[in-house]
Every structure is written in structure tokens, then in C-alpha cells.
A protein has these predicted regions:
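Catalytic alpha/beta core domains of metabolic enzymes, predominantly
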Residues: 2-3, 9-145
Length: 150
């Protein structure tokens, strides 16, 4: 069954990150099947598998919003934390990782950091509970940015 391919991305400290590739209905079904298989709901974290800036983040953003709206309207099967791997997604973009884009694109390191910051900021604004980043400098930058807002 195709569910198995999406079932388990990581299992750390007895928490399960379930990935359902930008499909809210499949996410809900996966949560139900996981609970039926014996995983406790409080041990589940959902990864909607969103893209980065320029590569489908708008669709991922809307899926996250719909999950949160369903959770707020009492959908118990979507009432689980949402995690995004924004660092990983950011570095899939050719604009973030390519060293051959020319001077107009700027230095590779600066560009990749900007891609990760923009992607993570958008996903935090969408309402994710956990954002996994790649660079400690980005964590510090985002903390400074959000201190003025929160």
C-alpha cells in the first residue's frame, strides 16, 4: 500500500514524524492508521513536506493553514504538531546552492542563507510548530527578527 512509503521519516526519542506529501486528506488518514497501528497520538509529529521559496511554498503554506484551521475547528486527527525541514527544502533550490549563477546573484553563501531565512519565515508565519534549520547563524538571525514582533 502507498501509505507505507510515506509512513516514517524519522523516529527520534519515540516520536514519529509522518510525511504525507502536501495532502491534507492523506495526512489525516496516515494519522488515523498510525494510531490504529498502536502509535500514541501524542507521539506523532506531521511533516507536510512543503517546498521552498520559488518551489511550491505557496501550496505548502495553504496546506499548513488548512491543517491549522481544521485543528481549530475540532478535527482531532489533525491536532498534532507540524514540523517543517525548511533548511533541507531551501538547499534543494538551484538558486540557493549553485555556484555558477553569475555576479548578479551574489555570493553563494549569502544567497543560500537568504533562501533559508525567507523559506523559514514564511512557514513560521503559516503556523508551523517546529522548523528544522541547517545553519546556526540562521537560528540567531530569526530569533533577532522575531523578538521585535513577538
Amino acid at each position: 500500500m502507498y501509505i507505507i512509503a510515506f509512513f516514517l521519516r524519522i523516529n527520534i526519542f519515540d516520536l514519529f514524524t509522518l510525511c504525507a506529501c502536501l495532502d491534507i486528506n492523506l495526512t489525516k488518514e496516515l494519522n488515523i492508521l498510525s494510531i490504529d497501528a498502536g502509535i500514541k497520538k501524542e507521539d506523532i509529529i506531521v511533516d507536510p513536506d512543503t517546498g521552498c521559496i520559488g518551489y511550491g511554498i505557496d501550496y505548502g503554506y495553504s496546506i499548513i493553514e488548512r491543517m491549522i484551521e481544521a485543528k481549530n475547528n475540532g478535527d482531532d486527527m489533525l491536532d498534532v504538531p507540524i514540523i517543517v525541514f525548511s533548511g533541507l527544502e531551501s538547499y534543494k533550490a538551484k538558486e540557493a546552492k549553485s555556484k555558477n549563477l553569475g555576479e548578479i546573484w551574489g555570493e553563494s553563501k549569502t544567497r543560500s542563507y537568504a533562501w533559508e531565512i525567507a523559506t523559514t519565515t514564511a512557514l513560521i508565519c503559516a503556523g508551523v510548530d517546529i522548523a528544522v534549520l541547517w545553519h546556526p547563524e540562521i537560528v540567531d538571525e530569526l530569533k533577532r527578527s522575531f523578538q521585535g514582533i513577538c
